């Protein structure tokens, strides 16, 4: 999978969960962060400074690790993509 595919997968899962739980602040925050990462991946000229302030990893662990492991894994992968992109490093997920 490519980095953008990891983001799209996580975004699809978040949108699905938001359909079930509209207005859930944690999911809305995750959606916003995923959309930002996606924008940065598609347009390299965008400001990347906010990539250093992502909270997707902690959201994944604190909110979904036990209750929704699929979403948790997708958010952790997306967080990894965002952090590596912010540091200008290669994203090497399986």
Curated annotation (Swiss-Prot):
Species name for this entry? Answer: Pseudomonas aeruginosa (strain ATCC 15692 / DSM 22644 / CIP 104116 / JCM 14847 / LMG 12228 / 1C / PRS 101 / PAO1)
Q: Which domain of life is it from?
A: Bacteria
The record's disulfide annotation reads none
One MF term in GO for this entry? toxin sequestering activity
Please state what is observed when this gene is inactivated: Deletion mutant cells show Tse6-dependent intoxication with a dramatic increase in division time.
Q: Which InterPro entries does the record associate with it?
A: Tsi6
- Which BP terms does GO give this entry? protein secretion by the type VI secretion system
Kindly provide the name given to this protein in its UniProt entry: Immune protein Tsi6
Q: In UniProt terms, what function does this protein have? A: Immunity protein that plays a role in preventing early activation of toxin Tse6.
